[in-house]
Amino acid sequence: MYLGYIRVFWQPWLIGLGFSVATIGILESGAGRFGAISGLTQVIGGRFSDSRGRRRLILAGSAFLITTWLTAATAFLFGAPMLVYLAYVLWGLSLLSLPVIDAMMADYIEIPDRSRVYSTMLVANFVPGSITGFFAGQYGSSLSPPVLLLLAAGLETVGFALLFAKVRDKGAATSTRKAPLSLMATWDAISQFRGFFGVFMMDSMAWALGTGILYALLSTRSFTLIDFGLLALTQPLGVVVGTVPGGWLTHRIGARRLLMASEILGASMTLGWAFYPVALLIPLYGIVWGFAISSWVPAQFHLSTVIFPEARRGEMLGALATSIYLIRIVGPILAVGLYLALGYSAPMTAGAAAIFANVILIMKFIPRDQSGPLKRKPQSN
């Protein structure tokens, strides 16, 4: 619920606290939602969830988030930038639960229903966030960052209590299988799906390049809190509209086509931000952005949970997340370099070109037939 305004206002808040665009880019690469720490923690969380249960990892992620927002609120309340660095690290650690949540969903949901259920959950997550993001934009001048961050901590505490009361491990997830802890064992498993991993790694890097520091860049173009609030409202509308192709039609038109459509929409939106960054077009960009998300994420979830073996599902989902996050580190760093060298539009233009290039990888490595479980075949790449 609160991530709707955190996601949109976090970077502008940091600008107001005195952080530069370059510093924000480095922080996002190292310890942000898509940074190095975030990626490394996910493979650890996924692997341990296979052998020790999903529940405790999910609760740990929520606890880290509560600490994150309390630390960030203290940083803004007392004007202590050093605490922002700690908040970034805690935020990265909180994401250890992401692949665990996906693995738990796959444990309980049958294959034909996974993409539809996942799309429904996307809507349930985005719509409340859009409302809070919109009102935060409208009243951002009277509600300071510490107040909104404390609200986030409070809402996450409620979420933790609900998780503690309701979430239970399924028998298969609590088996005593001892997963090998060597990196070589994980690498051997990943090598069977090199092309599959490559598609999602390329997508992650391209989107990080095009949008990784977007909100910080928009802050330099005189966009207001009201503008950011409008973006927070319209992006989830795109998610709602895109739920139909993203979830309900995965098995009818194929995940492959949905992934390509998502990339084309995303690249078009990124080019729009690059060359037409005007407030009048914010609703259009927000809806297209949300539609791209809702077309991509359920298809990725469906493909991942089908292709990865059940006994190592948490580990492989974590490995995929880690691969995606580690390659994403490059995006904000390149974006900062392009911004400093060539100006505002360069990062988004380069990101759009990379997104278009990923369509070729999708055509090469994602199979057409989605009528049943994907079959592994020897990789020639």
Give the predicted meaning of each segment.
Residues 81-96, 201, 281-295:
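Hydrophobic core of transmembrane alpha-helices in multi-pass small-molecule transporters
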Residues 88-125:
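Cytoplasmic helix-loop-helix junction between adjacent transmembrane helices
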Residues 1-39, 192-231:
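Helix-loop boundary and gating motifs at the non-cytosolic
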